């Protein structure tokens, strides 16, 4: 198995373990979680405010929020008794750098294949 450290993501960027990458992609694999992430990047919300926007229980929305938190894609803070959730733009950029590294690998492979085909 190839380590994500070997992808040479951005030297100044995050250093992902296999488990961290799994959590990020698992979180982003669900449409509801992507929508929650979009909403919390646009502005802070409570879980109750988020739950009002979906045709599912508060507990189900809470589980989606937990998955996003475990992936590091959203953070929370308290204002009095209220727990406010917001998307973490730095984490999103880190995930983008990881995807960019994968793209670079595949582009290099295609370029090598093109070069081999051009030799014939």
Model features per residue range: what roles?
Residues 1-20, 38, 93-120:
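Amphipathic alpha-helical dimerization/coiled-coil segments
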Residues 19-59, 79-97:
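N-terminal helix-turn-helix DNA-binding core of bacterial DNA-binding proteins
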Residues 65-66:
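Short, hydrophobic-biased segments on the C-terminal half of alpha helices
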Residues 72:
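Glycine-centered, phosphate/nucleic-acid-interacting loop/turn motifs that mediate DNA/RNA or nucleotide
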Residues 76:
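Short beta-strand "wing" residues that participate in macromolecule-binding interfaces
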């Amino acid at each position: 198995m190839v380590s994500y450290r070997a992808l040479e993501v951005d030297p100044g960027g995050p250093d992902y373990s296999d488990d961290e990458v799994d959590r990020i992609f698992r979180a982003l694999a669900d449409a509801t979680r992507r929508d929650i992430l979009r909403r919390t990047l646009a502005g802070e919300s409570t879980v109750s405010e988020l739950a009002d926007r979906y045709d599912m229980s508060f507990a189900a929305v809470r589980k989606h929020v937990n998955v996003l938190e475990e992936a590091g894609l959203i953070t929370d803070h308290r204002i009095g008794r209220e727990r406010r959730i917001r998307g973490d733009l730095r984490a999103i950029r880190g995930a983008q750098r990881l995807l960019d590294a994968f793209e670079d690998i595949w582009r290099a492979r295609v370029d090598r294949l093109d070069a081999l085909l051009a030799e014939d």
